[in-house]
Amino acid sequence: MTQDPVLVAYGSKRGGTAEMAEWIGDALRAANLTVEVRPAREVRSLSGFGPVILGGALYSGRWHRHARAFARRFGRQLRERPVWLFGSGPLDDSADRLEPGKLFGTGGLRKTATRLAARDCAVFGGRLERDARGFPASAMAKKSAGDYRNPDRIKLWAKDIAAQINHDPR
């Protein structure tokens, strides 16, 4: 039996989370899985997909609106398949040091993980360019600009997901 493709869907405002989704997709492909990486707002159906990884940037304590909308729109279908969630956003190294439950602004993400019976919910550091525009990004960039993503940690998380899918796809 052929495994249905894995969908990696994401909500990203400035491109950092989109790049993380691609890293996750690459790690899954390296484990011989078929993967599609798409912006969450462009996904119209989960038909033809198996496991789903859904990620979104965290802004001011909220998960990206496209990730939230995706989770609401496909909630019942997501509860019927393996699902993993991730958030990106702390603009420091706290995501590498603390459990998601101890990170500020992750409550909504964790509630969604519970509602969808996600197998895991990870939080990774984010990225904010010094020249970010708009409020509150421009104000935050003055003191917290930088790339706090940890590609090795993200790829290791994806590698663990691949092992779970290859061992027990349902």
Residue locations for each model-derived region?
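Short, hydrophobic/glycine-enriched beta-strand segments
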Residues: 6-10
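Short amphipathic alpha-helix with an adjacent loop that forms part of the alpha/beta core around
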Residues: 42-47
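Short polar catalytic/cofactor-binding loops
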Residues: 11-15
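FMN-binding flavodoxin-like domain, especially the glycine-rich phosphate-binding loop
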Residues: 2-5, 19, 26-27, 31, ...
